Design a protein with these regions (language model features):
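N-terminal targeting signals for export/organelle localization
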Residues: 1-52
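Hydrophobic beta-strand positions
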Residues: 54-55, 156
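Structural microenvironment flanking redox-active thiols in thiol-disulfide oxidoreductases
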Residues: 86-125, 135-142
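Active-site acidic short loop of glycosyltransferases
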Residues: 68-71, 101, 127
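Thiol/disulfide oxidoreductase modules built on the thioredoxin-like
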Residues: 122-128, 133-181
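Short active-site neighborhood of thiol/selenol oxidoreductases, capturing the structured segment around
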Residues: 63-83
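Residue-level recognition of short loop/turn positions
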Residues: 58-61, 160
Length: 183
């Protein structure tokens, strides 16, 4: 009985080693490029997609995010049904007021319907622009590296169009301030 356990343990160890070696080799593609590194988001492409994204205000009127080009901007992907999104809005509004005088724009992108965003904004007024990007906003957030598809998701873009930070989950005001102060 003991020899069967030992034999089984040795088999499992050999199998695990083989899987580990295979996994290590498969993390390199045919060109020898690290697949994990290659999977990093192309942030320049994501920023270009952001500027071209079709968005509307809560009343359904088309808006243009391309007007933000050349300005540092905080983009917050959120939804009315997302508890953490709603909880962080007062902190984002406070930071917006604080950094507006430094020329940093804040924009909320509702991954939601026009109707839900409009009803939400009537109950909870926000002093920075909030647009509706709809459920396609999840694809745009993925382009910025949000592969989990979770909300809230915040992206900081500098005036040159470079992504300076991304955050999945509620923002930490101190953390966001450090990023904004460095712009």
């Amino acid at each position: 009985m003991k020899s069967k356990r030992i034999l089984a343990s040795v088999f499992v160890a050999i199998l695990a080693t083989g899987v580990g070696v295979f996994a290590g080799h498969s993390l390199l593609n045919a060109d020898g490029v690290d697949v994990a590194q290659a999977a990093q988001p192309n942030t320049q492409s994501a920023v270009a997609q952001l500027w071209a994204a079709p968005v509307t205000n809560a009343d359904g009127k088309p808006q243009s995010l391309s007007l933000l080009k050349g300005h540092p901007v905080v983009i917050n992907f959120w939804a009315s049904w997302c508890g953490p999104c709603v909880e962080e809005m007062p902190a984002l509004a406070q930071l917006h007021r604080e950094y507006a005088k430094k020329g940093i724009d804040f924009v909320g992108l509702g991954v939601d319907s026009d109707k839900n965003v409009k009803a939400f904004l009537q109950k909870v007024p926000v002093d920075y622009p909030v647009y509706v990007i709809g459920f396609g906003g999840a694809d745009l957030a993925r382009a910025f590296g949000n592969n989990a598809g979770g909300l809230p998701f915040t992206v900081v873009i500098d005036a040159k169009g470079n992504v300076r930070s991304t955050k999945l989950g509620q923002i930490q005001p101190k953390e966001l301030k450090q990023t904004l102060d460095a712009l």
